[in-house]
Regions:
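N-terminal hydrophobic targeting/anchoring segments and the immediately downstream early-domain regions
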Residues: 25-197, 253-425
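Divalent metal-binding pocket/active-site signature
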Residues: 168-242, 247-256
């Protein structure tokens, strides 16, 4: 979830025969420019996206993921997921730390409930998933596996017991911080703000949170965190970590992106960096233009939200998203190739075993690269990687195999740690 939620305020996959067919067959055969060979590879993969903010729409707009409305501008629906062979989605459980002061956990529960309700409403197309076995089961049943990740450690309200409860409710990763520094983890979003009390990374309690996540089998997510928090998390975690929705800082100099040294560290840790589709993290010109209009954009959002409050209306993410889209439309979208550039860079620096997809769908209003308008466009990534010489095996890893591997290892480490006595906390 990015500025398309105030990120700017802190300055934010038929047959084997087809896969190995001749180059002539690899020519484009559909309107989107995706070849039969690319479709065969894409459709044989378990495609996993590690970050989508669609629960905000479930809750604020009463959006139905089964919607077939052609006018819907959202990135994810069951039809769009099927069209893009999206096999598993980690739905982001993001609680705005400003508008939900005093009830972070309560709003977290509301968002979790919204995901369960969608799965209950569409049992033929979607199922809740809590493990790698569940993801593979959903794939065999041709259903979307719905997983959940908390975006921002403030949701646990500084309580290990709440963290455990969220795991019991199905949360399978947690981003240690969002764009706000919380009471135990520094964020990249406000690291330069002298008014914020920082901790030089993770506090002792923050390290305890990481270790408890390891014990539970909850993936540690280092997107959004300050650089020192990243290094503390890497040093503390006994299991592989992920960056659920981050890109390469060497290509786009944004604090939310990952440096090459960090990429190498994630590779050594066995983790995965899942590339964010937000244009500001993929294209330097877009990032710079975003920063240039940030003050005016934030003022417009503030004024609009205050107007709603004065009218006695409840302010929602969708209200802010409406204004954000208007401002993002002022900046030209970069070409689709910038997304592939970041995947390619991370693969070259960290290795093809350590890169995946973390779209930030439905959290980057109108600000994805040209040609990436919804989950239905995911096969274009496979075509682009094929065009750059990636093997079918490596493409399947990038599409989801790497995340599945990391999740399996997190589960293994959890079983090992749970054989040990539980400390009183």
């Amino acid at each position: 979830m990015e500025t398309l939620k105030r990120f700017l305020s802190p300055l934010l996959f038929v047959s084997a025969a087809l896969i190995f067919t001749s180059p002539a067959v690899a020519q484009s055969d559909d309107a989107s420019g995706v070849s039969a060979r690319a479709h065969a590879i894409h459709d044989s993969a378990i495609v996993i996206d590690t970050h989508a903010d669609t629960p905000q729409r479930f809750l604020d707009e009463n959006f139905d993921i089964g919607s077939t409305d052609p006018k819907d501008i959202g990135h994810i629906s069951l039809d769009k997921a099927r069209a893009g062979n999206l096999g598993a989605e980690f739905f982001s459980i993001w609680v705005d730390p400003e508008t939900n002061q005093g009830h972070f956990a309560k709003h977290t529960l509301d968002l979790i409930d919204s995901v369960y309700e969608q799965a209950a409403r569409h049992p033929d197309g979607m199922m809740m998933a809590f493990s790698t076995d569940d993801i593979e089961r959903a794939h065999k049943q041709k259903k979307l596996a719905a997983l959940m990740g908390i975006e921002g450690g403030h949701s646990i309200e500084n309580d290990i017991h709440v963290l455990r409860d969220f795991y019991r409710l199905g949360v399978r990763y947690m981003t240690l911080s969002w764009s706000n520094t919380n009471e135990w983890a520094d964020s990249s979003g406000d690291i330069d703000d002298p008014k914020i009390q920082h901790h030089n990374g993770l506090t002792d309690f923050g390290k305890q949170v990481v270790l408890e996540m390891n014990r539970l089998g909850m993936i540690v997510d280092i997107s959004h965190v300050a650089d020192k928090t990243f290094w503390d998390a890497i040093a503390t975690s006994k299991a592989p970590v992920i960056a659920s929705h981050s890109s390469a800082r060497a290509l786009t100099n944004a604090p939310r992106n990952i440096t090459d040294d960090m990429l190498r560290a994630v590779a050594k840790n066995g983790g995965v960096v899942d590339v964010n589709f937000f244009s500001g993290f993929l294209d330097q010109k877009y990032w710079d233009a975003s920063k240039a209009q940030a003050e005016a954009q934030n003022a417009a959002i503030h004024d609009y939200l205050e107007k709603l409050k004065a009218q006695g209306k409840q302010v929602t993410y969708s209200d802010e998203d409406r204004i954000t889209r208007q401002w993002m439309a002022k900046i030209p979208r970069p070409p689709f190739t910038v997304l592939i550039d970041h995947i390619d860079h991370i693969a070259k620096i960290a290795g093809t075993d350590h890169v995946g997809l973390g779209s930030d769908f439905d959290g980057v209003a109108g600000a994805t690269p040209q040609g990436m308008d919804s989950a239905a466009d995911l096969p274009k990534i496979t075509q682009a990687l094929l065009d750059r010489g990636y093997s079918s095996a490596d493409i399947r890893k990038i599409l989801g195999g790497n995340v599945l591997r990391v999740f399996k290892e997190v589960e293994r480490v959890s079983r090992e740690l749970q054989a040990q006595p539980v400390q009183n906390q």
